[in-house]
Amino acid sequence: MTVTIAVNGQRRSVQPGSTVTDLVAEITGRAIATDGHAVDGSRVGVAVARNAAVVSRSLWWSTAVTAGDEIEIVTAVQGG
Protein backbone atom coordinates (compact mmCIF):
# COMPACT_ATOMS: atom_id res chain seq x y z
CA MET A 1 0.00 0.00 0.00
CA THR A 2 1.30 3.47 -0.83
CA VAL A 3 0.48 7.03 0.17
CA THR A 4 -0.37 9.67 -2.45
CA ILE A 5 1.22 13.11 -2.15
CA ALA A 6 1.95 15.99 -4.52
CA VAL A 7 5.55 16.95 -5.30
CA ASN A 8 5.93 20.22 -7.17
CA GLY A 9 2.32 19.87 -8.29
CA GLN A 10 2.68 16.30 -9.59
CA ARG A 11 0.93 13.37 -7.89
CA ARG A 12 3.37 10.80 -6.55
CA SER A 13 3.08 7.60 -4.54
CA VAL A 14 5.43 6.94 -1.61
CA GLN A 15 5.72 4.24 0.99
CA PRO A 16 3.95 4.83 4.32
CA GLY A 17 6.45 6.13 6.88
CA SER A 18 8.55 7.92 4.26
CA THR A 19 10.33 11.06 5.40
CA VAL A 20 11.41 14.22 3.64
CA THR A 21 14.94 12.76 3.59
CA ASP A 22 13.64 9.68 1.73
CA LEU A 23 11.85 11.87 -0.79
CA VAL A 24 14.83 14.17 -1.41
CA ALA A 25 17.10 11.14 -1.84
CA GLU A 26 14.71 9.57 -4.34
CA ILE A 27 14.27 12.76 -6.36
CA THR A 28 17.94 13.79 -6.39
CA GLY A 29 19.28 10.26 -6.79
CA ARG A 30 21.71 10.88 -3.95
CA ALA A 31 22.19 9.34 -0.53
CA ILE A 32 21.21 11.86 2.15
CA ALA A 33 22.46 11.70 5.75
CA THR A 34 20.26 12.44 8.76
CA ASP A 35 21.70 15.97 8.89
CA GLY A 36 20.20 16.67 5.44
CA HIS A 37 23.53 16.79 3.63
CA ALA A 38 24.68 14.44 0.90
CA VAL A 39 26.60 11.45 2.25
CA ASP A 40 29.42 12.18 -0.20
CA GLY A 41 29.88 15.64 1.35
CA SER A 42 28.68 17.60 -1.67
CA ARG A 43 25.91 20.17 -1.51
CA VAL A 44 22.37 18.95 -2.08
CA GLY A 45 21.25 22.40 -3.26
CA VAL A 46 17.54 22.09 -2.52
CA ALA A 47 15.03 23.54 -0.08
CA VAL A 48 11.84 21.77 0.93
CA ALA A 49 8.41 22.99 2.00
CA ARG A 50 5.67 20.70 3.29
CA ASN A 51 2.15 22.12 3.10
CA ALA A 52 3.56 25.64 2.54
CA ALA A 53 5.87 25.50 5.58
CA VAL A 54 9.63 25.35 5.06
CA VAL A 55 11.19 22.21 6.54
CA SER A 56 14.59 22.87 8.09
CA ARG A 57 17.27 20.59 6.65
CA SER A 58 18.05 19.30 10.16
CA LEU A 59 14.43 18.10 10.45
CA TRP A 60 14.15 16.32 7.09
CA TRP A 61 14.88 12.91 8.65
CA SER A 62 12.15 13.27 11.28
CA THR A 63 9.48 14.89 9.10
CA ALA A 64 7.07 12.23 7.91
CA VAL A 65 5.31 12.55 4.58
CA THR A 66 1.61 11.76 4.94
CA ALA A 67 -1.28 11.25 2.54
CA GLY A 68 -2.39 14.46 0.87
CA ASP A 69 0.79 16.40 1.67
CA GLU A 70 1.88 19.02 -0.82
CA ILE A 71 5.66 19.07 -1.05
CA GLU A 72 7.67 21.69 -2.91
CA ILE A 73 11.31 20.93 -3.63
CA VAL A 74 13.14 23.97 -4.93
CA THR A 75 16.60 23.84 -6.45
CA ALA A 76 18.97 26.61 -5.45
CA VAL A 77 20.60 28.50 -8.31
CA GLN A 78 23.28 31.16 -8.32
CA GLY A 79 22.64 34.50 -9.84
CA GLY A 80 21.57 37.97 -9.12
Give, region by region, the residue ranges found by the protein language model.
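Ubiquitin-like/PB1-type beta-grasp interaction modules and other compact soluble beta-rich domains
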Residues: 1-79
